[in-house]
Design a protein with these regions (language model features):
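Fungal secretory targeting signals
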Residues: 1-18
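Primarily auto-inhibitory N-terminal propeptides
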Residues: 17-102
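N-terminal hydrophobic or amphipathic helices/low-complexity stretches enriched
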Residues: 86-144
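Second-shell loop/turn segments in exported
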Residues: 113-122, 135-146, 173-175, 211-222, ...
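A non-catalytic alpha/beta surface segment that caps or lines the substrate-entry region
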Residues: 126-190
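Structural recognition of the beta-strand scaffold that forms the well-ordered cores
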Residues: 127-135, 171-174, 184-188, 196-201, ...
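Acidic/histidine-rich catalytic neighborhood of metal-dependent amide-processing enzymes
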Residues: 181-183, 213-314, 318
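Active-site-adjacent substrate-binding region
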Residues: 291-403
């Protein structure tokens, strides 16, 4: 067994190395500033970031927000000196904290006549086909050429979906980031108000064994969240195109680059929103929406995992209203720690955010970040429930006034 494993790994490495066009970034010793908790910053190398990911240690890479020189000058971190791998802890800087407004979210669903007809049009064959395409890229690692190719495929798919809308009803944006080629994608369905309702998912994948070399299909993490929100986008766009629905608040669907690098894409997006004084009344992250074997094996009913730590209580309560009204499974509250997905980037910039995952955290897929994160392991009936939730959230909150 050991020999077989060694040979298999060697073959995989040879195959990966033969992909000359992959063009992986190998800036292993570049210094980065990461935030590992509300009051902790560290100066680390890229190699240390990967090690932290392997250990399950969560963080936000804030290097694009605060330069290393400024961080040292402000006392956020100590100078790295001659070491590229030494980590440093520092106190929270008050200027980095941004208060989160309290909104008066609806306490009852009120748009059933719009939402219910759309839920009957969910096309799981389309969802499965999209995920098959998306997870077929060798990797969607944000520093790889195939990570850029997968972003191009996703952009083209989104562009086709919104092509039925008039030009003044939609804005489609590629958000380019400094330091890597994979871009984030923002679809903005223009409302009467510039206040934003955001649905998010991350498009990248990673193989933590050898990120620069090995295949990372990322079917569940986060291909499932991506196709969940793609189908919700298709249904919402169809409702707008047919006159069934016109958003009051501007409704946005975000597909973030480089979540696996420390929420790099989303922290860039929401930092720009903050700098431009944009208002976001709610952000819902869908990251891993398709795995139920962990719950079923333990004799637990399939359910949503509603993250209760480092999320917005008021928005979570609104999500509970949506689950009760439009979904066939319950939610279980669960915790995932600081900065466990892109909703943390919204919170860091003073925007209310929630995160819904496939189950309680202890039952979620364990094969993520490996070659084993494949489509055949997923439950599309469960993804169906996440789509229903996303459509309900998007329409109810985008039609809510006087928040």
């Amino acid at each position: 067994m050991k020999l077989f494993t060694t040979v298999s790994l060697s073959v995989a490495l040879v195959q990966a190395l033969s992909f000359g066009s992959l063009n992986f970034g190998l800036d292993t010793f570049a210094n980065r500033i990461i935030k590992t908790g509300p009051e902790h910053y560290e100066l680390v190398s890229e190699a240390t970031k990967i090690q932290y990911k392997r250990q399950g240690k969560k963080f936000i890479d804030v290097t694009s927000v605060v330069s290393i020189d400024d961080a040292v000058a402000q006392g956020m971190v100590a100078s790295a000196g001659k070491s590229d791998v030494v980590t440093f802890f520092a106190k929270q800087i008050k200027s980095v904290k941004k208060p989160i407004p309290a909104y008066n979210y609806p306490t009852n669903a009120s748009t059933q006549k719009v939402v219910q007809p759309l839920l009957k049009q969910i096309d799981l064959d389309r969802v499965k086909s999209n995920l098959g395409e998306f997870s077929s890229f060798y990797t969607r690692y944000y520093k790889s050429s195939t990570g850029l190719e997968s972003a191009d495929w996703l952009y083209g798919t989104v562009k086709d979906i919104v092509s039925v809308l008039p030009a003044d009803a939609v804005e489609l944006t590629k958000v380019h980031h400094d330091g890597w080629d994979q871009y984030s994608i923002i679809v903005s369905l223009v409302g009467k108000s510039s206040d934003k309702v955001v649905v998010g998912a991350h498009q990248d994948s990673i193989n933590l064994l050898f990120p620069n070399l090995l295949r990372a299909p990322g079917a569940d993490d986060d291909g499932s969240g991506t196709v969940t929100t793609l189908e919700a986008l298709r249904l919402v766009v169809a409702a707008i195109a047919t006159g069934l629905f016109t958003p009051h608040n501007t409704l946005e669907f975000h597909y973030y680059s480089a979540e696996e690098g420390g929420l790099l894409g989303s922290i860039d997006v929401f930092s720009r929103y903050y700098a431009n004084n944009n208002t976001v009344v709610g952000m819902l992250q869908q990251d891993m929406t398709g795995y139920t074997k962990g719950t079923i094996d333990e004799g637990v009913e399939p359910h949503f995992g509603l993250i209760s730590d480092y999320t917005s209580v008021g928005l979570n309560d609104f999500i509970k209203v949506i689950v009760a009204e439009y979904c066939s499974i319950p939610y279980h509250e669960t915790q995932c720690g600081y900065a466990c997905s892109d909703h943390a980037s919204a919170l860091e910039n003073g925007y209310p955010a929630s995160f819904l995952i496939e189950s309680e955290f202890k039952y979620t897929a364990k094969q993520i970040h490996l070659t084993l994160d494949t489509l055949d392991r997923l439950d599309f009936g469960h993804i169906h429930e996440h789509i229903k939730l996303t459509v309900g959230y998007a329409i109810e909150l985008s039609l809510a006034k006087h928040l």
